[in-house]
Structures are given as structure tokens and as C-alpha cells.
A protein has these predicted regions:
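Bacterial N-terminal signal peptides that target proteins for export
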Residues: 2-18
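Cleavable N-terminal signal peptides
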Residues: 20-21, 32-33
Length: 573
């Protein structure tokens, strides 16, 4: 007998009720899941074997150098980066094409000074309006770009709504999703187009930029390698948009995860001084009430920049305690001069902890359980640590593996400035220690910490001491050499307590979370990494954060195998 035609007995009423209840519960669970915000990464992986840099001479190739690894010479994994602003997912700002006003060129204007360190943080984000141009993919001759025209945006507007100020208009062709691959296959991403072996990536023409500029749109994005159509419209398109004060993402990816409207989109990147462009990290927030809240903050220009400007004039990296222990200083590397803009295109050679940066678990933890040949002194510290806090963990979680949602959340600022001046000079070098009692005192007045909150310790140290030479000793050198008190830092007991409270990210407006005592610092980082927590160090402007209603956003550049990560922190309120 064919089993599919067997007559089934009628259902019992209780069975019907049980199935109905189960279906209702399933529907409620699905609705609850839809109400939860979801973070989506839209950034390309930066790694030497990927086509992450512009392939033409003399643009520098990306490089990561593992300067120190955990072992006899170092208790930390320390990386140095050679990176320029045309690397991976990136940001373009007006001076890319707009000349400074004093040059009196045809394209001169005040926006010629709107470098990456001058853009207001509200402009980095907004409501994603995804213009679907997948029908243009590969629809052009070799070496030429299919053109996104005003009618493509008009088509979006007919289907959804008019674009406007506060929107981030994103051109989705799925180009990077299809062609960003390890080399040599990855030559198709840019190099094969320049060599006229393949069609170009879709991009807007100048008329499309004029259309958007007249709509009041100031932020764009594309999942193409550049916003400039090849072979001869790259500069006209750039200037057509940048003259309005636009900024945009180049090299976005994974735009298929976004609805046509309603999601919050943002790109954050290191705050390089005088940068006409910059490497960055793009992400979105989809679902629940959070996207609308963040969109409204950006639209109403309620944003605070928490990252200092990165400049070779400033002491952005640790000079170390002893000779030879300093980190790579932050250097600007010029490689191509533009006579029209009177500007050097440039990259940077820097330690991965320069300025505001991420501390992932792998910074202080070895990758596996193999015995680590620590220096004898450090072995003693490890024994002391494990007696009190349990076995030190291991981790392979480098920067690119840290979910963006780990470094975003409701802001909880704990003011610890009362600790400044609390140590005895005879005990220097020493940092005042933030204790569990300090955190609990905060909770009594401000309410209990909640899962997913971002705790920021306000010390005031970077704001007070970040100065160019010769006034630069107060930030690092004097405290490390015992000539001044160190900055307040959390001890490992606080890390354990915050983990129990559901905290994943701890931030500070001090140079680091470890302080000037190397033993205590290492224990803090061991505790942090062993509990799968992360740090964000070197903030500024924490005093400007409102006491309630502020949302913290930080994202590090998506560099593979990096044991720290430069990035940008902002607050939206």
C-alpha cells in the first residue's frame, strides 16, 4: 500500500491545543528574535594575500609584521602595520579631490580642509538606503565601468521613498562579494580591469552624484573597489560628490544582508591627521529599536568623537619601561605627490596600538596550551596569577575575529578621577588601582551594570597629557620612569567582577588598561583575555558623554592575525 495515501485517524482535541500552543510559542520566539538588534559586518578582510590595496605603482603594499611574540622577550603579541588609506574597506573625504582654498584652483574650497580628522562623527552613520544595481554587474566592455545613473536612484525612490539628508545611500552590485578573493584569483578585483582583461565595477556617474547632492545626501557607499568609474570618470565622479561635502565607503561587502531601508549603517576608521582618505570598518545594525535610535542621533548631529587625532607629533605609542622595549612609533609615509592638491598621498607605519585601539584576547594569551618559555620573572607572576584567578587561558581570537557587537553597547562611564594622587611617591612607578568597591559604588548611584554595557573608566589622563614634544613626557615617560604617578587602572579583581556582570568590553581614557606596574598590568590582561573580554584603550572626550542615553560604537580595521587594532570610537546620544 502506498503510505502517502493511508487514512489518518482524526486528531484528539488535546493534540490540537498542544500543537496550537507550540505554533504560538514559535511565532513569539521568532518575533522576539526579530526585535533583537543584529550587527552585520560589511568590511573586507585585510591580509597580504588579498587584493586589499590599489595595485598600481607607487601605492604601498599592505604589510603586517609580528614584531614580538609571546615568549622569553615579550609577554605580549606585538604587531606593526604598514597601511595606507586605500586599503580594504575605506573612507573617502572631500580633500581627495577638493583643493584647499588658499591654492586658488578651479576646484578649491573650504572643503579642501575637511580631512578624515575633521569630519564630524554624526556624518559617519545614518539610515541605509540600498540601491540595487546588480543588473549592471559585468555589463560593460573590458576596462570600463557600468554606470549607475540618476534613474537607478529614481527607481529606488519609486519602490521605497525619496532619499534625503541623514541617509547613507549604498550602491549594491555584489561586486566585492563575487570578486574579492585571494591572489592570483583576486586580480579580478582591480588589476584585471586596469589591464583591460575584465569589465569594471559598477559606479555612479557625475550626474548621479549631482542628483544625490541636490537631495541633501552627504554619505554614500559602494561594494565596488572604488567610487570612481573606469577608465576616465573616476575624478569627475569624485569631485561631483565631494564638492557637496560628501563622504563615502569604498569596498563595502555583504550588502545583501540589509533591507532596502531601515537599517543603521556606519563606517569608522582611524583618525589620521590630514588624511584625504582612510582605512576603516563598515557595519550595520538591523532589527529592533536600536537602528532607529542611532539613525535619529546621526540625523540630529548628536555624536561625540572619543578618538584623538593620530599625528607623528604626538606620543601615541608606548616608549616602554626599559631600553629597546618601545613600540613602533606612528609615522606618516609619503609616496605620491599631487601637484594640483599640493598634497602627498601617504600611508602609515605604526604599532597596532597607536591611538584608540582594540585589545583582543590574543594580545596577552598564547595560541594554545603548549608551555610558554616566559622569562623567569614572568613565570613567577603567572604562578601568582593562577593561584588566585585560575588557569590563564589561551586564545587565537585576533582582531578580525572579534564581533563588532562586542565593542558596541550602552555607555556606562565610571569616574575614577578621585584616585589621581592617591599613591605615595616613594612607591612610584605605580598606578592607582580601580577596585570592585569603586564599581559597586557607581552601581549604587547609577544602577546595576547590565549584560552588553560598555564600561568606560574616566581617568582624564589622555586629555590632560596628550601633547606634542617637548611637552609630551606626561603621558607615558614620566609615569613609566617613576617621575610622576601612573594613570588609574582596573585590577584583575575588577575584570572578574565585570565579567560576572555580563560585561564584554572595558574602555578607558588612559593610554592602556594595564598601567605602569608590569606585573599588575599583565595580570589584568590575562584576566581580560582569559574571560573572552576585550578592551578599548586611549579614548578622549569622555567628560562630554551624557550621563544617560549614550550608545558607544567602536570598530577596528579588519586586519587578519592582528593582536591589536587601530580604530575609531564615537558615542551617539
Amino acid at each position: 500500500m502506498n503510505r502517502s495515501y493511508r487514512i489518518q485517524p482524526p486528531w484528539h482535541p488535546i493534540q490540537v491545543l498542544l500543537w496550537s500552543a507550540a505554533l504560538v510559542a514559535l511565532g513569539l520566539a521568532r518575533n522576539a528574535a526579530c526585535d533583537e538588534p543584529r550587527f552585520v559586518d560589511h568590511s573586507l578582510l585585510v591580509a597580504p594575500e588579498y587584493p586589499c590595496t590599489w595595485p598600481s605603482h607607487p601605492f604601498p603594499r599592505f604589510a603586517i609584521i609580528h614584531s614580538r611574540t609571546i615568549g622569553p622577550e615579550s609577554a605580549y603579541n606585538i604587531d606593526t602595520l604598514l597601511i595606507d588609506g586605500n586599503t580594504g574597506t575605506q573612507l573617502d573625504v572631500p580633500p581627495h579631490s577638493v583643493a584647499r582654498p588658499e591654492l586658488k584652483r578651479e576646484k578649491s574650497g573650504p572643503l579642501g580642509r575637511a580631512y578624515t580628522d575633521k569630519i564630524e562623527p554624526w556624518q559617519f552613520g545614518g539610515e541605509a538606503c540600498v540601491v540595487d544595481v546588480r543588473d549592471l554587474l559585468d555589463k560593460a566592455p573590458k576596462g570600463a565601468s557600468p554606470l549607475v545613473r540618476p534613474e537607478h536612484v529614481a527607481r529606488f525612490e519609486q519602490q521605497h521613498r525619496p532619499v534625503r539628508f541623514g541617509d547613507v545611500v549604498l550602491f549594491r552590485s555584489d561586486y566585492s562579494d563575487k570578486y574579492y578573493r585571494p591572489l592570483p584569483e583576486g586580480r579580478r578585483f582591480i588589476a584585471d580591469i586596469l589591464d583591460r582583461k575584465a569589465p569594471g565595477y559598477p559606479d555612479p556617474d557625475p550626474d548621479c552624484m549631482e542628483f544625490l547632492g541636490n537631495r541633501g545626501v552627504l554619505t554614500l557607499g559602494t561594494d565596488s573597489a572604488s567610487m570612481g568609474p573606469l577608465p576616465d570618470l573616476a575624478e569627475p565622479t569624485h569631485y561631483a560628490g565631494l564638492k557637496y561635502g560628501m563622504i563615502w565607503t569604498e569596498g563595502a561587502t555583504n550588502l545583501k544582508e540589509l533591507p532596502p531601508t531601515g537599517a543603521f549603517y556606519c563606517l569608522l576608521g582611524p583618525k589620521h591627521e590630514g588624511g584625504p582618505y582612510g582605512e576603516g570598518r563598515a557595519f550595520s545594525v538591523v532589527g529592533g529599536d536600536l537602528p532607529r535610535r542611532l539613525i535619529e542621533s546621526c540625523k540630529n548631529k548628536r555624536a561625540i568623537d572619543l578618538s584623538p587625532t593620530l599625528s607623528p607629533k604626538l606620543p601615541l605609542t608606548s616608549p616602554g619601561i626599559g631600553t629597546g622595549e618601545h613600540r613602533q612609533t606612528y609615522l606618516k609615509v609619503d609616496f605620491l605627490y599631487s601637484e594640483y592638491l599640493d598634497m602627498w598621498h601617504h600611508g602609515h607605519f605604526m604599532d597596532a596600538t597607536a591611538g584608540t585601539h582594540l585589545v583582543p584576547p590574543s594580545y596577552a594569551l598564547p595560541a594554545d596550551d603548549k608551555p610558554v618559555p616566559y622569562a623567569p620573572e614572568v613565570r613567577g607572576w603567572l604562578e601568582d596569577y593562577e593561584k588566585k584567578y585560575g588557569k590563564r587561558g589561551v586564545s587565537r581570537r585576533t582582531t578580525e575575529q572579534v564581533p563588532i557587537e562586542w565593542t558596541c553597547g550602552e555607555t556606562r562611564v565610571i569616574d575614577v578621577r578621585s584616585l589621581v594622587g592617591s599613591t605615595k611617591q616613594s612607591n612610584w612607578p605605580a598606578s592607582p588601582e580601580i577596585t570592585v568597591e569603586h564599581v559597586q559604588a557607581y552601581e549604587k548611584t547609577a544602577g546595576a551594570l547590565r549584560h552588553g554595557d560598555v564600561v568606560i573608566f574616566r581617568t582624564g589622563h589622555v586629555d590632560r597629557h596628550l601633547r606634542p614634544s617637548p611637552a609630551d613626557a606626561g603621558l607615558w615617560l614620566d609615569p613609566l620612569q617613576g617621575k610622576a604617578e601612573g594613570w588609574p587602572v582596573p585590577g584583575p579583581d575588577v575584570i572578574v567582577y565585570l565579567k560576572d556582570r555580563g560585561i564584554r568590553c572595558i574602555a578607558s581614557d588612559a593610554p592602556d588598561l594595564g598601567g605602569v606596574d608590569p606585573r599588575r598590568a599583565l595580570m589584568t590582561y590575562w584576566a581580560l583575555g582569559s574571560r573572552e573580554m576585550v578592551g578599548v584603550e586611549f579614548l578622549v572626550n569622555v567628560d562630554k558623554i551624557p550621563p544617560t542615553g549614550a550608545y558607544f560604537l567602536f570598530a577596528a580595521v579588519k586586519v587578519r592575525d592582528c593582536h591589536a587594532g587601530p580604530g575609531r570610537a564615537i558615542v551617539l546620544y
